[in-house]
């Protein structure tokens, strides 16, 4: 296979992923027919409002869906040509935290208060790379220095409560990158951090990606972060993917009515928004317990047609690399 052909094969490809949870009220269809891919060395943004399924998608990729009450009901997660859903758990543990790592959403609570940050960083490299205690500690110091923590040789022995929120997030990034993963999943990596620290964390992720070639899945609701950090963006609504494409194309020419509304709601994202009242998307997100046929956004969409409420729209390519699930677009370029 040529280098060009190899570059065209996605590092990660998700096909038809479905996830459901059993609740007291019934079955919640949390993810339905999720399709996405990530190329080597690129950053894909995954956006949508709270509860749309972004974090569940990340947990599914890591095979960390709690069972019960949740379960993966359908689909494939192809990583480097291998379906992760078919791997025995022992083999999946060799991938998780090693070749695919994750920065979890809450830096203030994601670290174990009973162990030093050095112990928590060295755990993964000793497990996956077979380093002894001395070499593992040296790697921990190296990673703390790489993420910009000063006096790393001393601080590697300190505990999470001795670090600020921004520094804890840097520790989380150091842990995630310690094994030099192929993919880094960053789930709202700047949650609860002030604006200055947010910018530092994004700069750090971008710099580490450029130096190591790691692909990044950036989960966020911040359209500014998407514009600054990502090559492509995928938009989710109520457990379904509604639009995907190059970031500059989607932000400048959004096709799905939900994407249009999401961008219009972001202060300053739309040129027409300056000096105008903030816009909102009318209505509420549909219950995941009451799935019906059709587009999940139909009841909130000003452009809805009768078939929008009865038939799920196909995935249609509106131009190269840009697809949308909406009946407003011709059906001639449907994705097989």
Region roles according to the model:
Residues 82-83, 135-154, 263-264:
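Conserved ABC ATPase "signature" region
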Residues 7-10, 27, 150-154, 244-336:
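Short catalytic/signature loops enriched in Gly
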Residues 72-83:
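Conserved ABC transporter NBD signature motif
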Residues 178-182:
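A short, proline-enriched helix->beta-strand linker immediately N-terminal to the Walker B motif
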Residues 84-101, 119, 127, 249-254, ...:
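ABC ATPase NBD coupling module
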